[in-house]
Amino acid sequence: MKKVSVLGSTGSVGKKTVDLLSKRKEEYQVEALSAHSNFALLAHQAKLLNAKYVAISDERLYKDLKESLLGTDVKIAIGATNIATIPVDLSVVAIVGIAGLGPVMEVIESGTKVIALANKESIVCGGKLLLKKAKEKNVQIIPIDSEHNAIFQILQNDDKCVEKIILTASGGPFLNYSLEQLRNVMVDKALSHPTWNMGKKISVDSATMMNKALEIIEAHNLFNISPDKIEAIVHPESIVHGIVTYKDGFNFAVLAETDMAIPISYALSGPERSALNRKLDLTKQGKLTFQEPDHKRFPALKLSMAVLNSSAPQTNSIVLNAANEIAVNEFLKSRIGFLKIVEVVESTMESFGSYTDINSLSDIINIDYESRIIAHKIVESKVVAYS
């Protein structure tokens, strides 16, 4: 029986993971679960999976969680970091944003063998520091993002003579919008993704294509491949998740339905494969289309290459991620327009002046903190409130 933990169990990926685990109780013993604020769902999940530990990040909800778990033996902590130290065979980390970095580092130190990682920000911002620590501790990182999971599976079979890797992007809900239409995008439209069911933040990132910018940086770090060998193409059907092109001209691609249960299941069971109901039928799919991204309407992609080709790629990765988290949050509150999201990110990157060597988690946190201050100032002073 595998011992597992799920950090961020009440988000979209976390809920999918819990659903899979609930159907495979004979295979997995759930040691720990964590959530930011959804104490009611966390308590339900803990009872469903017979979890030994739970953690809530919002300490104001500790009493509510405790009351919800009365009559059980579940131990309660505050903050995912406090249960990330529990050694397990596999830890699923599905916390959203930079908040996941600390817990990931703790999981690496805990003696856990495998991390199934849905938190791309950890790889984007943690970079070499995180991956070096994982290598020292002999911790395998399996990405859950469908694109990186696809590339991971292909490279597991053959990582020699790679010419390039191709990440596919759905293009989001505004793929065919004009610039004028993009200026008037409302929040509810940005949250309506055509092919994936995701949380608010990643839905907006997909709409701006900032998600793909972050994924390019993630791919560079995770697969140790140079930026000029990473390409992103638009594939609206989201059936082809990743492609690896080899020097002899052969291309290996992973095709699957748009269901996060598929990469999650692989991460849980790999290298074995567990049966799932959703199977791809290409005859019913009809056509698969591919196109170049439009950088004028979706300039976020260029920022990823600017970051990776800069003199301080890790610092700039942290700045980009922090500014984007601030800008997306302001958009979700309808304080700035859709096109202003990338503008805030770009302005923050231009305004950030102090570049330091990154030798610790504290260095990353400090850069992230300073970037957020700059991004907030840019929002307040340069961006007209959206209405």
UniProtKB/Swiss-Prot annotation:
GO biological process terms, alphabetically, are: isopentenyl diphosphate biosynthetic process, methylerythritol 4-phosphate pathway involved in terpenoid biosynthetic process
Question: What protein does this entry describe?
Answer: 1-deoxy-D-xylulose 5-phosphate reductoisomerase
Q: Where does NADPH bind?
A: 10-13, 38, 119, 121, 199
Q: SUPFAM superfamilies from the xrefs?
A: 1-deoxy-D-xylulose-5-phosphate reductoisomerase, C-terminal domain, Glyceraldehyde-3-phosphate dehydrogenase-like, C-terminal domain, NAD(P)-binding Rossmann-fold domains
User: Record's PANTHER family?
Assistant: 1-DEOXY-D-XYLULOSE 5-PHOSPHATE REDUCTOISOMERASE, 1-DEOXY-D-XYLULOSE 5-PHOSPHATE REDUCTOISOMERASE, CHLOROPLASTIC
Gene of this entry: dxr
The cofactors named for this UniProt entry are: Mg(2+); Mn(2+)
Q: Which residues bind Mn(2+)?
A: 145, 147, 215
Q: Which Pfam families match?
A: DXP_redisom_C (PF08436), DXP_reductoisom (PF02670), DXPR_C (PF13288)
Q: What HAMAP family does this protein's entry cite?
A: DXP_reductoisom (MF_00183)
Binding sites annotated in the UniProt record for 1-deoxy-D-xylulose 5-phosphate: 120, 146-147, 170, 193, 206, 211-212, 215
Q: What does this protein do?
A: Catalyzes the NADPH-dependent rearrangement and reduction of 1-deoxy-D-xylulose-5-phosphate (DXP) to 2-C-methyl-D-erythritol 4-phosphate (MEP).
Give the pathway listed in the UniProt entry for this protein. Isoprenoid biosynthesis; isopentenyl diphosphate biosynthesis via DXP pathway; isopentenyl diphosphate from 1-deoxy-D-xylulose 5-phosphate: step 1/6
Annotated EC: 1.1.1.267
